[in-house]
């Protein structure tokens, strides 16, 4: 292809050359072309060019001459405004310039005459002035007419006389709440100038009011310009300006109102600082007298209140003198006055709050950077501080209020004074070591009405729990509160008195020390109370041991015959005292906590420490349900054996997983000794610095019960248990946070599988989780299909039934654990359960559910034996006696009145049959637990 291309190009080139040669040969010569006129002759002589140039210039000259001949005369041109008349040219511009200069001079003079004076500029924050000078001007209300002449001011600045106008305007008192006074709190002259401001009750709008000159001058002497620092040159300027006013009055014919509009770009006057009508000015001596009387009355009222009730030690001294103070006092061991005053604590005397808005200063958030500039200014304005400046300056002005607010809750919710036997970490960190405290805790609650029935006179709870549980779900120590008589009053005062946002303006160190000493006394008393209760519990244990020793040997329970791994009670049940034998009809027996321990908050949940009877080792598993509403009464919730049977599924974060023995194994316990298996159910929600619910995950180490009889392990001492509890209480933290955020607990598949393989089925009638509460007698008749009479030895043991019921229902015993029972699949579920009960005990046991109001949660309580799928077990969730109104109705240790009645409690929150353990997610029971948080 390249050869062909090159040959082709060579051919074309040769052809082009031949054609070009032919054209060059045939073309005409230059002369021929010139003769034919195609091109000009190249060699024309120079004379030809000169002649041509001359002809062109002649032609141009001819045209000019022709135009000059034909042009119009000057008159026509002037008429047509092409030319101006030479006579009018010079005088007109000169006159115009003179007129223009005169007009400019007039305008300038007018503006100078009407421009605002320096004091006016200072008042409107247009002119930057030293703070002391500004406050001197504002404190004395030194005012000038706005149109004073500046030139005269400069000329007469040395004059010394005060004109009548000047004395009148200088002496008119301004309102204490005016923007001039509210900015006084930060200047170095706050002390003396504050008194001057507070004694004046007029307003700056009434400068021109005609008051008697002699009275005004005497007032001026009383107000005393001595401490005002640098106002003296200002006074000189003021006098000269007022003297020059009379001379220059003719220069201000115009109304100055339109000129004010030009200032709107320089200055922002907030709405609450705009000029308002104020009462007529008062004589300053009379005003001082009135304010002294007012102060005296306020102090008298406060002293009377403090005589009758203890005042909260954290209140600031200056706040006792401020108006609009509303004390929500709690008449218990200490009280917190929640004062809401619109005054800044920098002023120690009253200012009549005429110009300041009536907003109450709420608590400041912990981080001032989050606030916008407008919000910062609003807070400053409420507190009577200057609102000008950059954002950092505004935040610096607000910092003292933020530090002194003493409010543990950062949001602007209502603050309710709550008397819990609780020691939250962020409120009272120095009381964590106390065994039981009745400490005050400001729960910031956005719900205004606490969910507490006023009918309960023995509650020591006066307020609502925090919506975002600040320190975990606070459970309360179950001890008779020493302030029962006052609790109802405090409850009513907190319900009716409303919640006031406090601004506690500082905690004095002395009063802090007093509070700490009071707290120590309270701690000692509660410790003594706890010791007494522990002694009572030990006596109770001995009584139970004696009864256990006298009991005849019983047949083993058929439905509790599966082997269950046993956890060391000493390691996992720190607060449990001596184990007790629990009668068969109640699978959850009392575990005595060391009387309400506020430093270790009790778990709110249903963690019934289940003690099996002498025949069975029962593995109990932690189940926490922090329900907050009091109508979910937990009493009567532990009456059926299903209540404490639950599958050990790791899907459920509330259950501690435990692997049980083979389903077919049976361990018959022939000794009357009972083994108590508790898994550290006192989840020590003690005060720790971390907020959020904390649950202990004791990581149970269960030893397979090789022998039929398990020895009774003595519980550890109280101090050891507390130490164990403190280490365990933080292990469920992350787990619960993840659970709440993601909605499910990350389950260990292997452990889950092993647990599910070992859980047998229970034959019986299947029931949905929302089944209504059936009659217990029918249920148990249905359950006892082929039964051995497991409870025949108890048929005449009515007193023992009652003792068990008392144990299981006593509020001190309900540190409530849910026990996990592994049930052999080859045995009937509840053989002879109803037969074994004496009539009275059975009635007392089961009728409580029918006496009480209906089920209170979507998942109704249920007593029927329920068959589950191949991997399920019936679950019973019982609520701790946390919300019931009678759980604090305890008697002194010698008596058992508080433990006597079963029918006083309400039904449990819910009993649920989980039909599938693998499906154990938050959709069924966990929602009910978490919806209250």
Swiss-Prot record:
Task: Name the InterPro entries on file.
Answer: Myocardin-like, RPEL_repeat, SAP_dom, SAP_dom_sf
What is known about the tissue distribution of this protein? Answer: Expressed in the heart and in smooth muscle cells-containing tissues (aorta, pulmonary vein, lung), but is not detectable in skeletal muscle, liver, kidney and spleen.
- PTM: Ubiquitinated; by STUB1/CHIP at the C-terminus, leading to its degradation by the proteasome. Phosphorylation by GSK3B is required for STUB1/CHIP-mediated ubiquitination.
Where on the chain is Phosphothreonine found, per UniProt? 891
GO CC terms for this protein?
A: nucleus
Q: Does the keyword Repeat apply?
A: yes
Annotated motif MEF2C-binding, positions = 12-27
Q: Where is the composition biased (Basic residues)?
A: 248-265
What biological function has been recorded for the protein in this entry?
Answer: Smooth muscle cells (SM) and cardiac muscle cells-specific transcriptional factor which uses the canonical single or multiple CArG boxes DNA sequence. Acts as a cofactor of serum response factor (SRF) with the potential to modulate SRF-target genes. Plays a crucial role in cardiogenesis, urinary bladder development, and differentiation of the smooth muscle cell lineage (myogenesis). Positively regulates the transcription of genes involved in vascular smooth muscle contraction.
Q: How does it assemble?
A: Homodimer. Interacts with MLLT7/FOXO4. Interacts with SRF, its association does not depend on specific DNA sequences for ternary complex formation. Interacts (via C-terminal) with EP300 (via the CREB-binding domain). Interacts with HDAC4 and HDAC5. Interacts with MEF2C. Interacts (via C-terminus) with STUB1/CHIP. Interacts with PURB.
- The protein in question is named Myocardin
Instruction: Give the lineage.
Output: Eukaryota, Metazoa, Chordata, Craniata, Vertebrata
């Amino acid at each position: 292809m390249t050869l062909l291309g090159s040959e082709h190009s060579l051919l074309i080139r040769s052809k082009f050359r031949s054609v070009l040669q032919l054209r060059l040969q045939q073309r005409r010569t230059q002369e021929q072309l010139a003769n034919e006129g195609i091109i000009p002759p190249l060699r024309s002589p120079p004379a030809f060019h000169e002649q041509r140039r001359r002809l062109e210039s002649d032609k141009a000259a001819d045209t000019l001459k022709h135009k000059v001949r034909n042009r119009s005369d000057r008159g026509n041109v002037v008429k047509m405004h092409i030319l101006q008349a030479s006579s009018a040219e010079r005088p007109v511009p000169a006159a115009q310039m003179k007129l223009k200069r005169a007009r400019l001079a007039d305008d300038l003079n007018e503006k100078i005459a009407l421009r605002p004076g320096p004091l006016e500029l200072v008042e409107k924050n247009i002119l930057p002035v030293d703070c002391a000078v500004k406050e001197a001007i504002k404190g004395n209300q030194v005012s000038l007419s706005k149109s004073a002449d500046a030139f005269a001011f400069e000329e007469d600045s040395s004059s010394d006389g005060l004109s009548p106008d000047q004395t009148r305007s200088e002496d008119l008192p301004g309102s204490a709440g005016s923007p001039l006074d509210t900015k006084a709190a930060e200047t170095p002259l706050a002390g003396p100038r504050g008194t001057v401001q507070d004694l004046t009750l007029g307003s700056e709008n009434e400068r021109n009011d005609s008051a008697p000159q002699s009275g005004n001058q005497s007032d001026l002497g009383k107000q005393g310009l001595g401490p005002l620092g640098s106002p003296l040159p200002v006074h000189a300027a003021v006098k000269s300006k007022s003297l020059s006013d009379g001379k220059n009055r003719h220069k201000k014919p115009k109304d100055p109102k339109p000129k004010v509009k030009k200032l709107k770009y320089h200055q922002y006057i907030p709405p609450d600082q705009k000029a308002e009508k104020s009462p007529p000015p008062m004589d300053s001596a009379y005003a001082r007298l009135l304010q002294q009387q007012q102060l005296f009355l306020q102090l008298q009222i406060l002293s009377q209140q403090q005589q009758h009730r203890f005042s909260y030690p954290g209140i600031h001294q200056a706040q006792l003198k401020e108006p609009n103070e509303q004390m929500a006092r709690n008449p218990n061991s200490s009280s917190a006055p929640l004062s809401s005053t619109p005054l800044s604590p920098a002023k120690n005397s009253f200012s009549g709050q005429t110009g300041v808005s009536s907003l109450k200063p709420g608590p400041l958030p912990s981080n001032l950077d989050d606030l916008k500039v407008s919000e910062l200014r609003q807070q400053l304005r409420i507190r009577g501080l200057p609102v000008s400046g950059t954002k950092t300056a505004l935040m610096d002005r607000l910092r003292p209020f933020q530090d002194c607010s003493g409010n543990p809750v950062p949001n602007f919710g209502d603050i309710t004074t709550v008397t819990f036997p609780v020691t939250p970490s962020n409120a009272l960190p120095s009381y964590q070591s106390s065994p039981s405290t009745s400490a005050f805790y400001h729960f910031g609650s956005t719900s205004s009405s606490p969910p507490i029935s006023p009918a309960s006179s023995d509650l020591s709870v006066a307020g609502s729990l925090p919506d975002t549980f600040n320190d975990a779900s606070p459970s309360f120590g179950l001890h008779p509160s020493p302030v029962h008589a006052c609790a109802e009053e405090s409850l009513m005062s907190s319900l009716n008195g409303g919640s006031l946002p406090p601004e506690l303006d500082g905690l004095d160190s002395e009063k802090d020390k007093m509070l700490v000493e009071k707290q120590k006394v309270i701690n000692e008393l509660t410790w003594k109370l706890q010791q007494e209760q522990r002694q009572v519990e030990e006596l109770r244990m001995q009584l139970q041991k004696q009864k256990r020793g006298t009991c005849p040997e019983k047949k083993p329970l058929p439905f509790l015959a599966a082997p269950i791994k046993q956890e060391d009670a000493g390691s996992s049940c720190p607060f449990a005292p001596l184990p007790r034998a629990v009668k068969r009809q109640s699978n959850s027996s009392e575990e005595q906590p060391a009387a309400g321990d506020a430093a270790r908050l009790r778990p709110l949940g249903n963690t019934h420490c289940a003690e099996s009877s002498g025949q069975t080792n029962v593995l109990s598993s932690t189940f926490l349900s922090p329900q907050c509403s009091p109508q979910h009464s937990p009493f009567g919730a532990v009456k059926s054996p299903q209540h404490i049977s639950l599958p050990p599924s790791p899907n459920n974060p509330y259950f501690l997983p435990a692997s049980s023995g083979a389903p077919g194994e049976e361990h018959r316990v022939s000794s009357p000794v009972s083994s108590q298996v508790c898994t550290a159910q006192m989840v020590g929600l003690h005060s720790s610095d971390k907020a959020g619910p904390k649950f202990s995950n004791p990581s149970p180490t269960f030893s397979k019960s090789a022998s039929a009889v398990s020895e009774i392990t003595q519980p550890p001492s109280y101090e050891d248990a507390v130490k164990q509890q403190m280490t365990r209480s933080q292990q469920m933290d992350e787990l619960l946070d993840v659970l709440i955020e993601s909605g499910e607990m990350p389950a260990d598949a292997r452990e889950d599988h092993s647990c599910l393989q070992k859980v047998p089925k229970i034959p019986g009638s299947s029931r949905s989780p929302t089944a209504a509460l059936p009659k217990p007698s029918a249920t148990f008749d249905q359950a006892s299909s082929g039964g051995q009479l497991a409870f025949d030895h108890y048929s005449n043991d009515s007193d023992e039934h009652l003792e068990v019921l008392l144990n299981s229902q006593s509020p001190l015993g309900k540190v409530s654990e849910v026990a996990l029972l592994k049930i052999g699949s080859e045995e009937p579920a509840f053989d002879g359960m109803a037969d074994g009960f004496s009539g009275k005990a059975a009635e007392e046991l089961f009728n409580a559910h029918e006496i009480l109001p209906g089920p209170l949660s979507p998942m109704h309580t249920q007593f029927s034996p329920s068959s589950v799928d191949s991997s399920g077990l019936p679950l019973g969730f019982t609520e701790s006696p946390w919300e019931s109104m009678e759980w604090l109705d305890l008697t002194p240790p010698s008596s058992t009145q508080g433990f006597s009645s079963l029918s006083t409690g309400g039904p449990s929150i819910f009993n649920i049959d989980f039909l599938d353990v693998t499906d154990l997610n938050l959709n069924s029971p966990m929602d009910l637990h978490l919806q209250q948080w």
